């Protein structure tokens, strides 16, 4: 049963351009949350996002983060807690680039374009009225 819930959560996350809420600690030490689009995912183990300069500054000070996917129809809540890092490798930035980013950045070489990699340490999944908590 546990693997079924995990598989369903992974399927939800893997949908193309899935939106979620990313919570980070701001420069004053307070939690902040914002919506962000997933670029690529390996199930619930890790996710990547593309972003501008604001989030990397906060991540460099405190790399603890949380990600939440939520929907009312179908009903689910996928909460992941872990660490997030800033990826600066140009080849990875090119790999993560997708249509629509040109509305915010000039190209993968844009110095204000960053890739973030979130790695899950623990999770709380509520899918199909079933809940599962766990750690990696």
For each of these PLM feature ranges, what is it?
Residues 1-17:
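Short, basic/aromatic recognition patches
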Residues 12-27, 65-69:
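A short, Trp-centered hydrophobic/proline-enriched beta-strand micro-motif
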Residues 16-19, 31-34, 78, 109-112:
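Short, basic and Ser/Thr-rich N-terminal targeting/leader segments
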Residues 19-46:
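N-terminal leader/targeting helix
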Residues 25-27, 37, 52-54, 70-72, ...:
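Histidine- and/or cysteine-centered catalytic micro-motif in compact active-site loops
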Residues 30-33, 57-59, 76-78, 125-126:
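Short acidic/glycine-rich loop or secondary-structure boundary segments that cap or lie
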Residues 39-75:
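A short mixed-secondary-structure module that forms the rim of ligand-binding clefts
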Residues 79-136:
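Charged, gly/pro-rich active-site loop segments
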């Amino acid at each position: 049963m546990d693997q079924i819930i995990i598989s369903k959560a992974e399927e939800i996350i893997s949908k193309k351009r899935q939106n979620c809420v990313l919570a980070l600690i701001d420069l004053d030490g307070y939690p902040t949350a914002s919506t962000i689009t997933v670029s690529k995912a390996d199930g619930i183990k890790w996710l990547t996002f593309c972003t501008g300069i604001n989030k990397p500054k906060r991540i460099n000070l405190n790399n603890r983060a949380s990600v939440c996917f939520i929907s009312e129809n179908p009903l689910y809540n996928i909460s992941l807690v872990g660490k997030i890092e800033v990826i600066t490798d140009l080849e990875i930035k090119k790999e993560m680039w997708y249509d629509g980013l040109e509305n915010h950045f000039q190209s993968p070489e844009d110095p204000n374009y960053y890739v973030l990699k979130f790695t899950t340490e623990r999770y709380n999944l509520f899918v199909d009225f079933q809940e599962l908590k766990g750690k990696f």
